[in-house]
């Protein structure tokens, strides 16, 4: 039923893309609820639909355009936001779907709300008490993404994110701490710290000092993590470049303040290709840093992502990448075949790699990594670990995660049937076996 004279206006929402986009969606949804809008999960009952898009690679662009088209077909009133909305100042989306009501870029909640207000005025008497203090979230209650900055100062040749989200803009640390405290009070037991470049947090603010609860707090990733570590929940860091000052986080991991886990987007192992990517090209220094991290924190889990088939990548470059992979022994790895992104400087680099070769290299890469992952997971068999219940599967089977695994992108711990457990519970388990991706265990104590 659509909104009438006495019914609140209803908004449908489709959120695509990365965790940073998820946080943008949550902020918009929270404000909509505060203004009295109802949020619905189907096109038929919505008065207007918002589609938060991704535009990073071709597959994401296609998915976003399809989602916009479906929303137009099923509902007819659509507001588009997100990274794809920033392409060509919105003309790219309008060219494909001229009937959309409005197009905005990422991190533009105000513009999205203005477009919704124009199409569907808010109720005159919003009940702000309908919104929980931690806001509305798209993740399960037991974990939450905590975005600490917008934009990026890097100029990687394969990426157009800076042109979409702009230069680095760090949030004030006291603002982040207030949000984190509200999330924990609302039931979050894990905070996943995200940004485009987490280690660069505070550079734009010149690391100025703020105050939280009367205590000084520097706008610096080490100080922020130390403060988050006092909240008594898992704190997991994503999108961390291997800057030298990341070494300062290791004592916090050793003390149990933050998880011994780093998501480090390395992208390649060949200095020549790294230079073409406009990434730090000293792969041997990165390898030394990884080995140093592991000496300081033996339980450290390192996740990374790589690109194969980058323009100009030769067999020798790919062999260097595999050598790097074997030497680094990373725990969790994702690999993508290079996909040209409209507007990226890498498109002008000569030596395009044929698609079949890209896929062959990707398969070879993942075969090497699978053996490494299997071996590293096997070392945990026989250990006792504290895990977080993530989901209940068919037949009462329990799916959990250890401190080594981020939601959705890493592995899980399969526990079989375990009576009395609920999503969000902590439980101690004994690891009984492992494969290349997941662990298997039995409950020791809840």
From Swiss-Prot:
The UniProt entry, under PROSITE patterns, shows: MTTASE_N, MTTASE_RADICAL, RADICAL_SAM, TRAM
Assigned EC number:
2.8.4.4
Report the SUPFAM superfamilies cross-referenced here. Answer: Radical SAM enzymes
One Pfam family here: UPF0004
State the Gene Ontology terms under molecular function. Answer: 4 iron, 4 sulfur cluster binding; aspartic acid methylthiotransferase activity; metal ion binding; protein methylthiotransferase activity
Cell compartments where the protein resides: Cytoplasm
Top EC class of this enzyme: transferase
Keywords carried by this UniProt record: 4Fe-4S, Cytoplasm, Iron, Iron-sulfur, Metal-binding, S-adenosyl-L-methionine, Transferase
- Please provide one cellular component term from the Gene Ontology annotations of this protein: cytosol
Q: Which cofactor does it need?
A: [4Fe-4S] cluster
Q: Does the keyword rRNA-binding apply?
A: no
| Catalytic activity, as annotated | L-aspartate(89)-[ribosomal protein uS12]-hydrogen + (sulfur carrier)-SH + AH2 + 2 S-adenosyl-L-methionine = 3-methylsulfanyl-L-aspartate(89)-[ribosomal protein uS12]-hydrogen + (sulfur carrier)-H + 5'-deoxyadenosine + L-methionine + A + S-adenosyl-L-homocysteine + 2 H(+)
Its domain of life reads Bacteria
GO BP, sorted A to Z: tRNA modification
Instruction: Please tell me where [4Fe-4S] cluster 1 binds in this chain.
Output: 18, 54, 83
Chain ranges of the Radical SAM core domain: 138-375
Residue ranges of the TRAM domain?
Answer: 378-445
Return the similarity comment.
Belongs to the methylthiotransferase family. RimO subfamily.
Q: What does this protein do?
A: Catalyzes the methylthiolation of an aspartic acid residue of ribosomal protein uS12.
Name of the featured protein: Ribosomal protein uS12 methylthiotransferase RimO
Q: Which organism is it from?
A: Acidithiobacillus ferrooxidans (strain ATCC 23270 / DSM 14882 / CIP 104768 / NCIMB 8455)
């Amino acid at each position: 039923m659509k909104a009438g004279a006495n019914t609140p206006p209803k908004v449908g929402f489709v959120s695509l893309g990365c965790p940073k986009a998820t946080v943008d969606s949550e902020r918009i949804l929270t404000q909509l609820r505060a203004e009295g809008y109802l949020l619905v999960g189907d096109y038929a009952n919505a008065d207007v639909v918002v589609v938060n898009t991704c535009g990073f690679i071709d597959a994401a662009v296609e998915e976003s355009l399809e989602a916009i088209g479906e929303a137009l077909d099923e509902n007819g009133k659509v507001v588009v936001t997100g990274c794809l909305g920033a392409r060509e100042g919105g003309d790219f989306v309008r060219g494909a779907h001229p009937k959309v009501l409005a197009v905005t870029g990422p991190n533009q909640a105000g513009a999205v709300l203005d477009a919704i207000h124009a199409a569907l005025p808010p109720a005159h008497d919003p009940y702000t008490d309908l919104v929980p203090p931690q806001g509305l979230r798209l993740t399960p209650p037991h974990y939450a993404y905590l975005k600490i900055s917008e934009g990026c100062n890097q100029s990687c040749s394969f990426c157009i994110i800076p042109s979409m989200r702009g230069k680095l803009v760090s949030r004030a640390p006291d603002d982040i701490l207030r949000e984190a405290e509200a999330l924990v009070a609302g039931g979050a037991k894990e905070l996943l710290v995200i940004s485009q470049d987490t280690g660069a947090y505070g550079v734009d603010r010149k690391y100025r000092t703020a105050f939280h609860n009367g205590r000084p707090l520097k706008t610096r990733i080490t100080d922020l993590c130390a403060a988050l570590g006092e909240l008594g929940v898992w704190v997991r860091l994503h999108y961390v470049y291997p800057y030298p000052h990341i070494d300062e986080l290791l004592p916090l991991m050793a003390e149990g303040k933050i998880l011994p886990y780093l998501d480090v987007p390395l992208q390649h192992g060949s200095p020549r290709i790294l230079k073409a990517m406009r990434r730090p090209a000293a792969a041997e220094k990165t390898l030394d840093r990884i080995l140093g991290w592991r000496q300081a924190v033996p339980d450290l889990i390192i996740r990374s992502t790589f690109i194969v088939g980058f323009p100009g990548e030769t067999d020798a470059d790919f062999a260097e990448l595999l050598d790097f992979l074997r030497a680094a022994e990373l725990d969790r790895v994702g690999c993508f075949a290079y996909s040209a992104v409209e507007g990226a400087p890498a498109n002008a680099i000569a030596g395009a790699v044929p698609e079949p070769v890209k896929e062959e290299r990707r398969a070879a890469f993942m075969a090497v990594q699978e053996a490494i992952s299997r071996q590293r997971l096997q070392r945990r068999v026989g250990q006792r670990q504290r895990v977080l219940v993530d989901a209940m599967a068919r037949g009462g089977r329990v799916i959990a995660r250890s401190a080594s695994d981020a939601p959705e992108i890493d592995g899980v711990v399969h526990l079989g049937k375990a009576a009395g457990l609920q999503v969000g519970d902590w439980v101690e388990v004994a690891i009984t076996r492992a494969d290349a991706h997941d662990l298997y265990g039995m409950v020791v104590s809840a």
